[in-house]
């Protein structure tokens, strides 16, 4: 759910901000660079200390952080695509900005957006599992892999599966998202 929101909002805002001249608003770009330099884990710490630890707080914190990074990615890619010959030809032929964004630019950056979403899904899983492992779980009654690993540590000698199986599932889940992202990256680009 969080990755779908990241992708949708990030693509829309990134396309809107990236159209036109690159670097036209230096202040906005500086602010965007500053907020994307903050790691997602820092957003998570700030949100948890402000609103308490719950599922919604963790998802919102990671989603906000990743939306900002997606906006920066899509904005940069949009600015790069706008300078290419096929977009200049579309502008010269009288195509509207909406048509240029939808038909010419979006297909060329969608793979990067999907790749980023796959990698960010793995990052969300690792962050939430890590925070649950150190005791900042998702709340009472919510079971997740990080808290399962943390609770299983005390009986690791007697039942190592209580730690190893959740760790294996974290590993496999993150690996599958990373492999999916790599496969999308290897797919190449679409030249319109």
Label for each model-derived stretch:
Residues 64-65, 111, 117-118, 160-192:
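C-terminal transmembrane helix and the adjacent membrane-cytosol boundary/short C-terminal tail
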């Amino acid at each position: 759910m969080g990755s779908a929101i990241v992708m949708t909002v990030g693509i829309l805002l990134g396309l809107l901000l990236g159209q036109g001249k690159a670097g036209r608003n230096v202040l906005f770009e500086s602010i965007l660079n500053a907020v994307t330099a903050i790691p997602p884990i820092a957003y998570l710490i700030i949100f948890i200390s402000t609103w308490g630890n719950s599922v919604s707080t963790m998802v919102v914190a990671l989603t906000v952080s990743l939306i900002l990074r997606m906006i920066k990615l899509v904005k940069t890619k949009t600015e790069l695509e706008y300078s290419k010959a096929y977009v200049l030809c579309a502008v010269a032929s009288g195509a509207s900005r909406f048509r240029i964004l939808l038909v010419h630019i979006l297909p060329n950056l969608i793979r990067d957006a999907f790749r980023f979403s796959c990698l960010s899904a793995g990052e969300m899983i690792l962050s939430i599992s890590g925070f649950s492992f150190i005791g900042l779980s998702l709340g009472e009654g919510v079971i997740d892999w990080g808290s399962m690993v943390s609770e299983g540590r005390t009986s690791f000698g007697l039942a190592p599966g209580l730690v190893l199986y959740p760790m294996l599932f974290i590993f496999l889940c993150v690996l599958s998202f990373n492999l999916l992202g790599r496969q999308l990256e290897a797919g190449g680009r679409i030249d319109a």
